[in-house]
Amino acid sequence: MRLCGVASAFLSTLILIAHIDASTNLNVSVTDVQNISLPGDQIGNFTQSVSGPPSGDEERTSANSAIRKVDLFVEKLITFQVALRAKINRFLAKLKLAWWRLRNVDPNVTFNKLNLHEADNDILSLDNFHTWVKLVESYNLQHPAEQVSILSKLQEQFGEFEVSIMLEQAKNGADKYTEDIALELQHEQISRWRDDNLSLTALYKALQFGKSEPSLLTGPALRVWNIYTSNIESAETSLFDYLYQTIEDAHLSSLLIAAKQSPETVELATKIQNQLRQKWLEILVPPNLVFQHYKLDTNPTHLLDRPETKLWVRYQKMYWGKTKKEVTLKEMIEDFYKADEIAIIIKSATTDYGKHLAKKLPQCDSKHFKTFHNLTILPLLFVFHYTIGAEDDLSSEKNLISQYNHVPTSCETANCVAGGCLFENCASPLLCRGGLCYFRKCKDATCEGGACIFDNTAEASCPGGGCQFVNVPVTLADGYCDGGGCTLDGDDHPSSLAGSLAE
């Protein structure tokens, strides 16, 4: 302490001299600086040499040189002081450690004496924790019947599953000793879980997978799960099943997209993504919802280059294989993007796959353009309908139907693309893409671009054409008319043609 006091006084004197020298006409030489002495508690005299009246430049040069030398000396002294303090601290720590070992102090006591009871989640990297680990090892050697568990002490302070996350994070630390401790403790914890038959359900809840946090599938919780499941033989539900039951489809899809960006989790994320797609196919999730789940409806830039677009195209093909309902990428883009955004989608394609898809989109129209198209074709539909049907409301239904039979059609005909098509009593789904179609007593029919009349067709929908609903107990609010220009018959339906067009 006496030495530190002398050193502090010495430093203060040097700095004071430097400032005095810089603000006066004194000329300090190298010899003068070297003559600084420290006899006991007294600071040696600082001899100054005064020559004749110096010039301004000489005065500034001499002052700056003296200040630089004093600064250099001060820096060296501070460095020495820091190094000396570190050595003293290490010596005292070793002395304290030896004293505790000699007295066989209980590690639970030394844990608090080292202030580890106040430590945060980074406790595993602290020097005091490393010291305590050595104390525990020494204590356990001398007291085989009174073993102290490092893992139990950590779990007591932080919680069992919180410690599992801490250990996994510490395994990737910069300090080798910390990594070794974390690896050993993790092995002990996994063994305990296995011996206690910890269920995957309990582990899933404890690791809080269901929080839907963005980093969920790229963080340490997933790695802990994988380590435990690789150490047990279990026929329990897979990770995907837990994720699917606790996380909304759109959120889960986003998590998987993020997880695929990490080399550590890309393989698992791809596997779960495939499982999710199979689940969607089982329950026949509509392609437009999958399009949104993949976040393909929000940003037109590089849309065709994204791996999620390829996933959607693959899903659409599988969906068609199960339902025979074709929904194209062109239709999805038209539904979710305006004309100027579609231009961005086409121009921003850079990959070979994206450019290949872009070639199929030059004729894309936005939904706004399709609405205009529907408004144009709808009057033609009604003129056509009432002209060919009869001169008045008493015309027979047979005459009306016969006028539509311009081309050979049957229930096996999936699409009507031109002419007038008649479908009657059909159980299979049918599409009208460009013709004038009449659906009567059919189970399911869709009018995507033509002009259609639905008569007693229970599951009719009009996403793009000009449509009239006859004897169909629905309203526009039921989703039957979700993009086309539509009218509903009679007083049973409050929605009118004018109302639907205004909407």
From Swiss-Prot:
Location, primary (coarse class): secreted
Subcellular location: Secreted; Host Golgi apparatus
Keywords, comma-separated and alphabetical: Glycoprotein, Host Golgi apparatus, Secreted, Signal, Virulence
Protein name per the record: Secreted RxLR effector protein RXLR-C08
Record's GO cellular component terms: extracellular region; host cell Golgi apparatus
Ranges that cross the membrane: none
Organism: Plasmopara halstedii
Domain notes: Has the canonical dEER motif, but lacks translocation RxLR motif, which characterizes most oomycete effectors identified so far.
Primary role: Secreted effector that suppresses pattern-triggered immunity (PTI) in plant host.
